[in-house]
Curated annotation (Swiss-Prot):
Purpose of the protein: Peptide chain release factor 1 directs the termination of translation in response to the peptide chain termination codons UAG and UAA.
Disulfide bridge partners, by residue number: none
Protein name, as recorded: Peptide chain release factor 1
Modified how: Methylated by PrmC. Methylation increases the termination efficiency of RF1.
InterPro entries: PCRF (IPR005139), Pep_chain_release_fac_I (IPR000352), Pep_chain_release_fac_I_sf (IPR045853), Prokaryotic/Mito_RF (IPR050057), RF-1 (IPR004373)
Species whose genome carries this gene: Thermotoga maritima (strain ATCC 43589 / DSM 3109 / JCM 10099 / NBRC 100826 / MSB8)
Keyword terms of this UniProt record: Cytoplasm, Methylation, Protein biosynthesis
Modified residues (N5-methylglutamine): 211
Gene: prfA
Spans traversing the lipid bilayer: none
């Protein structure tokens, strides 16, 4: 970080910089100073927490400063990440496990709903399809709030549950999965969709159990012909609203597709967000008999399963952010590029 700062100081001292370059490097310098400030506050808070533990302070006092530390990490992520968008689109689908996987998908949807409430974010359901037993075959929802995508992107992947299903009479523990995909919502101006590339179909919206809930064809299905991406929406009252919602989702999926294609061209080090839903690709396990949640990306374990499912996700996400920052600081920063020699 100090080397980056010195590099920009040298760049700012060059007499041949244009006003635009001067402005850009000035902004980068200010950003580094703010990052340094928050990094120092994180270090001080960590040291203070250790001191409280050594002195045997009560857990409530320690917990207060741990929550403050979680918030500092999220502020640091907001500064570091170029993808710290305030708008996210979240998609949840059952993986392996049949009806139990659909019930687990419902639990995850409830968890994110509660988390959004805790963060003061706005959550809007775009599309939801339920099973006869109350599980979810698919749910797509928008989340809007400070750094919503920058935080929720850590939830992308395969989530695994180990528990006795309500449908299991023998009391045996089953393993099921659900996939979560988190995409940044993309503005219309940021990605071009040509009308001639779209096939738009309308149909009657259906409710629980497949029964039709209205007599007009208000539901909309959009197919992007060049890529084969299909988006349908029937939650809104009018055909126009459903079409606009479907286009919002389509823009995000096209952006993600373009991003993944670009990343594959540059590097093979990243994989797709959610994989196939196979158990071996899990990012997190929720073990009910042991009251345990384990995030396999960082070997993090908590025995607060119910609290986490009730939306208390800040601690686990902050650990992921901390790991991300420590391992990818230079890549995440992406600043301090040198000026071309003339």
């Amino acid at each position: 970080m100090k080397e980056k700062k010195k590099e920009i100081e040298k760049l700012l001292a060059r007499p041949d910089l244009t006003p635009e370059q001067m402005k850009n490097y000035g902004m980068e310098y200010a950003k580094i100073e703010e990052i340094e400030n928050i990094t120092n506050r994180i270090k001080e808070t960590q040291e203070f927490i250790e001191l409280l533990r050594e002195e045997g302070e009560n857990e409530l006092e320690i917990e207060k400063y741990e929550k403050e530390l979680d918030q500092l990490y999220q502020e640091l992520l907001f500064l570091l990440s170029p993808e710290a968008s305030d708008k996210a689109i979240v998609e949840i689908r059952p993986g392996t496990g049949g009806e139990e996987a659909a019930l687990f998908a419902r639990d995850l949807f409830r968890m994110y709903t509660r988390y959004a409430e805790r963060k003061g974010w706005n959550l809007e359901v775009a599309e939801i399809h339920e099973t006869d037993l109350g599980g979810i075959r698919e749910v797509v929802f928008f989340v809007k709030g400070k750094n919503a995508y920058g935080i929720l992107k850590y939830e992308s992947g395969v989530h695994r549950v180990q528990r006795v299903p309500v449908t299991e009479s023998g009391g045996r523990i089953h393993t099921s999965t659900a996939t979560v995909a988190v995409l940044p919502e993309i503005e219309e101006k940021d990605i071009e969709i040509r009308p001639e590339d779209l096939k738009i179909e309308t149909f009657r919206a259906s409710g629980h159990g497949g029964q039709y809930v209205n007599k007009t064809e208000s539901a909309v299905r959009i197919t992007h012909l060049p890529t084969g991406i299909v988006v349908s929406c029937q939650n809104e009252r009018s055909q126009y609203q459903n079409k606009q919602t479907a286009l919002r989702i389509l823009r995000a999926r096209l952006y993600q597709l373009q991003k993944e294609q670009k990343e594959r061209e540059i590097s093979q080090k990243r994989k797709s967000q959610i994989g196939t839903g196979e158990r071996s690709e899990k990012i997190r396990t929720y073990n009910f008999p042991q009251n345990r949640v384990t995030d396999h990306r960082i070997n993090y374990t908590s025995y607060r399963l119910q609290e986490i499912l009730d939306g208390d996700l800040d601690e686990i996400i902050s650990k992921l952010i901390e790991h991300d920052i420590e391992n990818n600081l230079e890549e995440v920063l992406g600043i301090g590029a040198s000026v071309e020699e003339k």
